[in-house]
C-alpha cells in the first residue's frame, strides 16, 4: 500500500500541495482526479521521490521508497511523461540499458516488450514511434521489476481504441494480482470503467477519497426514467405523490427525481393503481464526468466562458 500523509510541496515561495493525505490500497485501482493545474503530476513526482517534499511523508508498505535502495524497481514502477527517450535508440536497446542499470535480466526486458505488444518493432528507432507506442514502451519500463506498486500518469494518452481497451485490461489485471495501482486520466469515462476508488484533488488540496460507487452516489437524488403509453394521464396522476420532481424530455419520456429512496416502488404502485401501460422504467445515474465537474467546480484554475446568446 502507498500511504501519503500531510504531503506539502513548494516551488520557490509558492505552495502547490497543501497537506495531502490519502492511500492507495493493494489489490485495487485508485483513480487520481483533479482539474488541470490541481497538482496531480506534482503529487506523483513527490510520491516517487523525483521532487523534494516540503513536509509530510510517503511510504510504500510502511517504508519510504529510499529505504528499499536496490529493490526500488521491484517496489515501484511508474509511467510519467514519455519524453525521456534517446530518440536514436531502438526500443530494445532502450529497455535493455535500463534493465542492466537496475540489475534486471535482459530476458525480462524482452519479456516486457512482448507484454506491451512491441516485440515486433523492438529494433525500430524510438524517434519513429507514435505517441501511443511510446506510452507502451514507457509501460514496459515501468513493469521491468515486476513492481508491487504502479503509478501511471495519463497512460491511455495517444492510444487508439484497441490500445485503450488493452491498457484498461492490463491495469485491472495488475490490481487483481495484488498490486496497488494509482492512475490519473482526463478521460473520465475510461476512468469510470477502470478504477475501484477515487482520490480527488483541487488546487493542491484533497477534495475527497471515495469508492467509485460512493462518489457516483454523492449528492445524487434517485432518478427514474419512464415511458408510458399515455404520458399526459400519468403526469396528472403523479400529482398525488409528494416530494417528486418531474421533467418531461423532448423524446416524450418522463424523468422523476426524489429524495425518497423508494421512488421506484412509489412510481410502480402508481402505474399499477392507474392502469398505466409502462413501456420503460429505468433508474438513472449521473456519470463520472458530471460528478467530477460538480465536485471540482470551485477548484478550477480557469474556466471556459460560455458565449452562447451573446
Predicted regions and their residues:
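ABC transporter nucleotide-binding domains
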Residues: 2-4, 9-202, 208
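Short coil/loop linkers at secondary-structure junctions
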Residues: 51, 105, 119, 244-245, ...
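Short, surface-exposed acidic/glycine-rich loop or hinge patches that mediate macromolecular interfaces
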Residues: 65-66, 70, 103, 229-231, ...
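Alpha-helix N-cap/helix-start and coil->helix boundary motif
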Residues: 92, 188, 213, 231-233, ...
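Short glycine-/small-residue-rich flexible loop motifs, especially phosphate/cofactor-binding loops
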Residues: 96, 110, 171, 235-236, ...
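Residue-level "edge-of-site" marker
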Residues: 112, 126, 251-252, 284
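ABC transporter nucleotide-binding domain
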Residues: 168-258
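C-terminal coupling/interaction segments
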Residues: 259-310
Amino acid at each position: 500500500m502507498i500511504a501519503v500523509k500531510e504531503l506539502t510541496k513548494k516551488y520557490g515561495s509558492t505552495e502547490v500541495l497543501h497537506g495531502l493525505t490519502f492511500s492507495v490500497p493493494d489489490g485495487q485501482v485508485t483513480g487520481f482526479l483533479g482539474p488541470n493545474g490541481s497538482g496531480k503530476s506534482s503529487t506523483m513526482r513527490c510520491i516517487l521521490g523525483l521532487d523534494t517534499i516540503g513536509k509530510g511523508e510517503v511510504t510504500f508498505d510502511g517504508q519510504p521508497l529510499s529505504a528499499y535502495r536496490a529493490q526500488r524497481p521491484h517496489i515501484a514502477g511508474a509511467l510519467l511523461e514519455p519524453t525521456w527517450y534517446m530518440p536514436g535508440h531502438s526500443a530494445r536497446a532502450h529497455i535493455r540499458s535500463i534493465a542492466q542499470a537496475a540489475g534486471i535480466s535482459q530476458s525480462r526486458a524482452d519479456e516486457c516488450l512482448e507484454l506491451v505488444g512491441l516485440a515486433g518493432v523492438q529494433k525500430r528507432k524510438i524517434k519513429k514511434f507514435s505517441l501511443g507506442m511510446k506510452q507502451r514502451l514507457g509501460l514496459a519500463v515501468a513493469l521491468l521489476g515486476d513492481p508491487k506498486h504502479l503509478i501511471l500518469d495519463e497512460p491511455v494518452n495517444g492510444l487508439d481504441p484497441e490500445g485503450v481497451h488493452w491498457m484498461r485490461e492490463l491495469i485491472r489485471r495488475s490490481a487483481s494480482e495484488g498490486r496497488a495501482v494509482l492512475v490519473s486520466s482526463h478521460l473520465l469515462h475510461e476512468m469510470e470503467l477502470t478504477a475501484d476508488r477515487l482520490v480527488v484533488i483541487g488546487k493542491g488540496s484533497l477534495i475527497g477519497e471515495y469508492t467509485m460507487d460512493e462518489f457516483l452516489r454523492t449528492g445524487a437524488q434517485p432518478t427514474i426514467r419512464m415511458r408510458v403509453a399515455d404520458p399526459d394521464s400519468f403526469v396528472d396522476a403523479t400529482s398525488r405523490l409528494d416530494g417528486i420532481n418531474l421533467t418531461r424530455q423532448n423524446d416524450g419520456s418522463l424523468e422523476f427525481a426524489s429524495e425518497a429512496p423508494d421512488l421506484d416502488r412509489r412510481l410502480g404502485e402508481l402505474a399499477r393503481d392507474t392502469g398505466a401501460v409502462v413501456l420503460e422504467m429505468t433508474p438513472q445515474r449521473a456519470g463520472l464526468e458530471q460528478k467530477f465537474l460538480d465536485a471540482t467546480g470551485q477548484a478550477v484554475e480557469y474556466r471556459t466562458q460560455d458565449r452562447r446568446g451573446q
